[in-house]
Each structure stands twice: as C-alpha cells, then as structure tokens.
Amino acid sequence: MNISDVAKITGLTSKAIRFYEEKGLVTPPMRSENGYRTYTQQHLNELTLLRQARQVGFNLEESGELVNLFNDPQRHSADVKRRTLEKVAEIERHIEELQSMRDQLLALANACPGDDSADCPIIENLSGCCHHRAG
C-alpha cells in the first residue's frame, strides 16, 4: 500500500502519517526501488491506534507508548489499563477545572447588569480592582 491508500483507510492525512514516522511513533515502512514508502497491515494497525488514542485524549508521547505496548508480545493488559485509568483521572481533573471556570463565569455574568452603564462587575472582578469614574 502507498501513503495515499493508508491515509484513506486510517482517516489520517499523508502529512500526519509522515509526522508520526518522523517522530518514531510507528514502525518505519519499507521503501520500494523508486523510494516510495510501502505500508503493511501492521502500519495500518499502528496508525489507527495512534489516531484513536489521540481522539480519546492521549497526547503524542502517550499514544506512542500505546503503540509500543501494541507491538510488545510480552505486554500486560494491566499496563494498558493503568495508563487508560490515569488518562481518565486526568480528564476528570480537567472537567472539574472547566466546571469551576464555568461556575465563576456564570456568577460574574449574573452580577453584571448588562445595560448601557460603564459599571461592569465582570471587568472589575477580572481586573482585581474597582473602576471609579471621575464625576
């Protein structure tokens, strides 16, 4: 298979595939006599794993570690599960942070009259000071 075939099958761009190869995240493909990359089912599996791991929140390094585990016949599912649960905990912390930000913004929005006045509790709160206008 050539890179355009692999791109169609995996849903990745040719540029992304080359990037993953450059970063050493996938097994290097063989080169044909004319220098073109030749991909196998193994490459499809690795690239699909990378794409899907990225989609569920694993960063590049973590995704590469999953590919390494995928390629390790001595891997233990406990290692994969541990990494997955660590990612879930990280996502839960991020959700808590986002919920806190949302709550703060809603409280600020509720305190703001939203009228033609220059007085704005949102700006005052975010700037850390009170805005006083000369009368």
From Swiss-Prot:
GO terms for cellular component: cytoplasm; protein-DNA complex. PROSITE patterns: HTH_MERR_1, HTH_MERR_2. The keyword DNA-binding applies. Disruption phenotype: Loss of Cu-induction of copA, forms smaller than wild-type colonies when grown on 2 mM CuSO(4). This is HTH-type transcriptional regulator CueR. It contains an N-terminal DNA binding region and a C-terminal metal binding region. The gene is cueR. NCBIfam families: CueR, PRK10227.1. It comes from Escherichia coli (strain K12). Changing C129S: No effect on response to copper. Homodimer. Keywords: Activator, Copper, Cytoplasm, DNA-binding, Metal-binding, Transcription, Transcription regulation. Regulates the transcription of the copA and cueO genes. It detects cytoplasmic copper stress and activates transcription in response to increasing copper concentrations. Its main location: cytoplasm.
